């Protein structure tokens, strides 16, 4: 494994991609420290300290601590994710967008452009809501959060937060295209990982004050290790459908006749469902947290992590996005047609429509299992943790994102190394981390 890491620096392109990604992630973390003008940071920090364990704390986790400081990156990448969700949903019902999706690279660029426009619009709406809400907020000590309220502050805040989100979106796209891994996922990953030392410090502080016992801390560590183990095991799990290729004679040579398989991942949607589900819930909740209206606050309290309504809503969105994302990224009809053209068939299943129906049936069952797995990982640890006042960063959602993104990034690095005939991180084919099929 050590030799595998050493091989990274022997491949110039891979080394350049990794350093490029790390450099942009450092730029992102620097931007998290730059506050929006006109805000009392101490007053805002005291409000977030009082909001620990609420949905506002979960939103702050996904922003990497930027919301707590109200930095220029306070909105994080969530407006971009929300815009992506809206565009993907519209693609299924709007003929023009569906046609663009089928046009290949040019169509994809056009949809990406629409996603960027949507990101800016959502950022303006969310930024304005936060600006107005901040003007009504006061710290527990009575200090006002906004030093000079008014339209100048609102306009400056909207412009700053929108520009910050647009810059994060650009960073993510650059990492995906010129770096290693998925840029958007890595930005969320870095935000969670960078906040974990703070969460560990908070846990030890609770331990020192006697609010939690040593037995609970040990139980928490065991639970975390078990959850990480389950995530690694399931994320690499596959259902392999056997495929046979008929023999064909071309000239004097015989082709085909070999046996292979069609790999279907148990969780083919990866970390997308919990990220999308969190984004949907957080968008209205973020604005609600900054608006001091009783009925709005009641809604915000109802969708607080650990509450049954929040967990039920979260699971519902996870199931929806597991099936929706799988349907968007994997088309059984196309797979069956390509298999038929290449002379392949599933033993006992007729090529063509019957093969597509069989693959769709298997995929639906696997997706159900994957959705149950993602829901259990995200919800069950969070329910237990919320009852013991432990930071969110040890919850299932954070662990699934961290481990899932790490596996995906390692898979890409491993693929680069094996393509250039270098040994991967783990010796032996069975031990290697397999990439998503």
What spans do the regions from the language model cover?
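N-terminal cationic and glycine-rich segments that engage phosphates or anionic surfaces
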Residues: 1-101, 106-437
């Amino acid at each position: 494994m050590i030799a595998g890491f050493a091989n990274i620096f022997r491949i110039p392109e891979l080394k350049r991609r990794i350093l490029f990604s790390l450099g942009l992630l450092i730029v992102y973390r620097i931007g998290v420290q730059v506050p929006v003008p006109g805000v009392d940071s101490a007053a805002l920090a005291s409000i977030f300290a009082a909001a620990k364990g609420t949905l506002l704390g979960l939103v702050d986790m996904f922003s990497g601590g930027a919301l707590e400081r109200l930095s220029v990156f306070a909105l994080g990448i969530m407006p971009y994710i929300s815009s992506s969700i809206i565009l993907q949903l519209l693609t299924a019902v709007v003929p023009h967008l569906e046609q663009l999706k089928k046009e290949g690279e040019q169509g994809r660029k056009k949809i990406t452009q629409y996603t960027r426009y949507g990101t800016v619009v959502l950022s303006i709406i969310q930024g304005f809501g936060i600006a107005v809400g901040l003007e009504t907020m006061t710290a527990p000590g009575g200090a006002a959060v906004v030093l000079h309220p008014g339209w100048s502050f609102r306009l400056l805040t909207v412009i700053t937060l929108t520009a910050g989100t647009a810059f994060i979106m650009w960073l993510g796209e650059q990492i995906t295209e010129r770096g290693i891994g998925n840029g958007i996922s890595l930005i969320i990953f870095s935000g969670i990982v960078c906040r974990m030392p703070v969460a560990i410090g908070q846990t030890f502080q609770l331990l020192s004050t006697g609010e939690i016992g040593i037995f609970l801390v040990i139980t928490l560590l065991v639970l975390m290790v078990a959850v990480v183990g389950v995530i690694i095991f399931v994320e690499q799990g596959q259902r392999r459908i056997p495929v046979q290729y008929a023999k064909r004679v071309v000239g004097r040579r015989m082709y085909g006749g070999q046996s292979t398989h069609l790999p279907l991942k148990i969780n083919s949607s990866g970390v997308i469902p919990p990220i999308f589900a969190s984004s949907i819930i957080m968008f209205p909740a973020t604005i609600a947290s900054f608006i001091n209206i009783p009925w709005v606050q009641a809604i915000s309290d109802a969708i607080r992590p650990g509450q049954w309504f929040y967990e039920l809503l979260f699971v519902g969105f996870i199931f929806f996005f597991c099936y929706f994302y799988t349907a968007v990224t994997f088309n059984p009809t196309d797979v069956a047609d390509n298999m038929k053209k290449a002379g392949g068939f599933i033993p006992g299943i007729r090529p063509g429509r019957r093969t597509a129906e069989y693959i769709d049936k298997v995929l639906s069952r696997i997706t159900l299992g994957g959705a149950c797995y993602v829901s259990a990982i995200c919800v069950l640890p969070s329910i237990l943790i919320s009852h013991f006042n432990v930071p969110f960063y040890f919850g299932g959602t954070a662990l699934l994102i961290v481990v899932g993104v790490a596996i995906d990034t390692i898979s890409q690095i491993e693929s680069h190394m094996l393509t250039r005939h270098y040994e991967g991180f783990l010796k032996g084919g069975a031990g290697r981390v397999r990439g998503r099929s």
